[in-house]
Structures are given as C-alpha cells and as structure tokens.
A protein has these predicted regions:
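Alpha/beta-hydrolase active-site loop
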Residues: 85-106
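C-terminal catalytic histidine-bearing segment of alpha/beta-hydrolase fold enzymes
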Residues: 30, 203, 210-259
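Gly/Ser-rich "nucleophile elbow"/oxyanion-hole loop immediately N-terminal to the catalytic nucleophile
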Residues: 100-116, 121
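N-terminal cap/lid segment of alpha/beta-hydrolase-fold proteins
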Residues: 1-35
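Short beta-strand/loop motif that positions the catalytic acidic residue
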Residues: 189, 195-197, 201
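Short amphipathic alpha-helix adjacent to the substrate-entry channel of hydrolases
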Residues: 55-73
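Glycine-rich nucleophile elbow surrounding the catalytic serine of serine-hydrolase chemistry
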Residues: 119-129
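Hydrolase active-site cap/lid region
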Residues: 129-174
C-alpha cells in the first residue's frame, strides 16, 4: 500500500507562478489543451501542514484532473517548520493563493464561473476553510479524507501535537483560533461539499468526516459523505487506484453543477 504519493515517479511539471513574495507562496498551473476558457480546480496538498510535505504529493492528481478538461491551480503554502508557517500564515497563504486566480484568469484563459476546490487530508481541511473566506466564488468543494474537526483531531492526538503546532496551542488555551480555523465550527459554508473518505483510512479517522458532514447537513449545507470501500488514505489521490473513478466523477459533477 502507498504511504505517500512521493513513492511514485514525478509527473510532468506545471507552470510555477508566484502569488506573493515568499519562497513557498507559489502555485503550479496546468491548463488543458484546446481553447478556453477552462474550468478550474484549486488543489491543496496535505501532509498534516508540515514542511516536509509539499505539492509534489498531488502532481499526479493534477495531471489526471487536467486530462478531464480542467485547469488545475495547485497551491504551495507556508507550513509548520517554514518561516511564517502555522497560524495565521498557512491559512493566509491559501486565501491569497486562491484569490490570485483573479489576476491570471484572462491571460491563462480560465473560467472563474466554474471553479471547484479540492484538497487531501490537511489540504481537505484547508479547502473547507477556504469556502468560508470569500476569496473566490466556488461551485463546490471536494474534500478527500479531510481533517475537518480540529478540536477532535487534537483530542485524538492525530500525528502527535500537530494541531497544536498549527494553531499555537490547545483548544482550552486558544478556543477562538480553533473556532476560526476548524471547518466543523464554520458551517454553514454555503457551498456544495462532497467529502470522500476511505473506509480503511488509518491516518485520518473516518469518524471525523462523518461528524463533519452530519454537522454541515444540520446547518443546511449541501454536504454529502462518500465512503470509499476498502480505500486507505492515499488511494484517494492516486489516479491508478480503484478509488480514483469516484474522485474524478465527483469533481466533474461539481464543476458542472448549476449554480
């Protein structure tokens, strides 16, 4: 079983574009062949917000999505261990990077009326958070095994102290930060959400997605949980896996969804 998408050969690179001045404030843009304007998938990688994981994790996913006719805008961001990473820099970068599409849309022939955001693991947390920020209009969110409840993740000690490392402390000490950063506390998001989670995920418990979607539905959001039978954590970002068709179809459903 894959332990990381870094275990497979690299995909062809996208076009690297800076959305701010810092070393890690960049994104990789891939645009499909043919005339635009092209719909867009904002893609945010996971890795528990830590610096040792980067956007290489989702290169193959981006290539596969681009083959379906969508441009992909894969964001790097300051992470725990980078200068300025954690609270609030990590979140600020995601918001700024997403908003940067407005500046490059005309030149790159991007259709900003058809934008979805997809993220994996910690990136799933970040895309759900992004939906509440009004950085850019979104048709929908595809959250793949998201860390959607930061208080619960802290209670479970997922990846050790990483949630406290991200936000700077515990929920008891920094309740307002958890309230501002945790998707389950931000619902309703007002954007369609499709949450995919493997039933064999041993990195982010399925329980977290179940709790999140229940809360989102209760708030009135169009939120749906898709439990992918037999899939672990990384199969959801592997275009060669048996889980990929449902990921692909979910992205296409949302990008073509009537506003």
């Amino acid at each position: 079983m894959l332990t990381s998408m870094q275990d497979v050969p690299p995909a062809p690179p996208g076009t690297r574009i800076a959305y701010s001045r810092g070393e890690f404030q960049v994104g990789d843009l891939r645009v499909p062949s043919g005339r635009g304007p092209h719909p867009v998938a904002i893609v945010i990688h996971g890795g528990y917000w830590r610096a040792r994981y980067d956007l290489k994790e989702v290169e193959h996913l981006c290539e596969a999505v681009t083959r379906q006719g969508l441009a992909t805008w894969s964001l790097e961001y300051r992470r725990i261990g980078n200068p300025g990473g954690g609270w609030p820099g990590t979140l600020d970068d995601v918001r700024t990077g997403a908003a940067h599409l407005e500046k490059i849309a005309t030149e790159r022939s991007l259709d900003l009326k058809r934008v979805v955001a997809m993220g994996h693991s910690a990136g799933g947390h970040l895309v759900l958070w992004l939906a509440k920020q009004n950085a850019i209009a979104l048709r929908g969110i595809v959250a793949l095994a998201p860390v959607a409840d930061l208080r619960r993740a802290w209670e479970l000690k997922l990846s050790g102290t990483v949630v406290a490392d991200l936000l700077g402390g515990s929920p008891q000490d920094l309740s307002d930060r958890y309230r501002s950063a945790s998707p389950i506390e931000l619902v309703p998001l007002g954007v369609a959400q499709r949450v995919l989670h493997g039933t064999n995920d041993d990195v982010v418990p399925l329980e977290i997605s179940r709790r999140y979607v229940a809360a989102a539905k209760e708030s009135g959001d169009d939120s749906k949980l898709i439990e992918v039978a037999g899939a672990g954590h990384f199969e959801l970002i592997d275009p060669q896996s048996s889980a990929w068709p449902v990921v692909k179809e979910t992205v296409l459903e949302l990008v073509n969804k009537t506003p």
